[in-house]
Amino acid sequence: MIYGIGTDIIQIARVQGVMTRTNGRFAEKVLGPDELAKYHARKARSEKRGLAFLATRFAAKEAFSKAIGLGMRWPMTWRAMELMNLPSGEPTAVCHGELAAWLAERGLVVRVSVSDEHDYAVAFAIAERSGAAVSQPTAL
């Protein structure tokens, strides 16, 4: 059953501007450790691909946070969710710490899709309740 959906679009030039203003620290704030390693590898090959990677991950985290209904509030933090890729190339949300526990308590699984083209990066997320038994809130 669908729990929530989220979408986000960002102009890649905005990400480039923030990176310039923060002297590159924006990537360290937004990306988890595995994402950051992948970002640095892509950036080393092509500045443009590095920026597109960062923009898609930023958009994915925004879409993810909307789909779970928290926005960017605890336990949803920038680094608590990393968007990685399965061997097939399919993106997969890898959650850590309290966010992983929060999702498990609610029986939520979130699927994320990202894309980028020239000037923009976009992400879409669908949060679904898994088939596992989940405690329902009691009526007041």
From Swiss-Prot:
Gene3D superfamilies the UniProt entry points to: 4'-phosphopantetheinyl transferase domain
Recorded GO CC terms: cytoplasm
Biological processes, Gene Ontology terms: fatty acid biosynthetic process
Subcellular locations according to the entry: Cytoplasm
Family: Belongs to the P-Pant transferase superfamily. AcpS family.
Protein name: Holo-[acyl-carrier-protein] synthase
Function noted in UniProt: Transfers the 4'-phosphopantetheine moiety from coenzyme A to a Ser of acyl-carrier-protein.
Protein EC: 2.7.8.7
This protein's encoding gene: acpS
Cofactor: Mg(2+)
InterPro entries linked to this entry: 4-PPantetheinyl_Trfase_dom, 4-PPantetheinyl_Trfase_dom_sf, ACPS, Ppantetheine-prot_Trfase_dom
Catalytic activity: apo-[ACP] + CoA = holo-[ACP] + adenosine 3',5'-bisphosphate + H(+)
Record: residues binding Mg(2+): D8, E62
Keywords: Cytoplasm, Fatty acid biosynthesis, Fatty acid metabolism, Lipid biosynthesis, Lipid metabolism, Magnesium, Metal-binding, Transferase
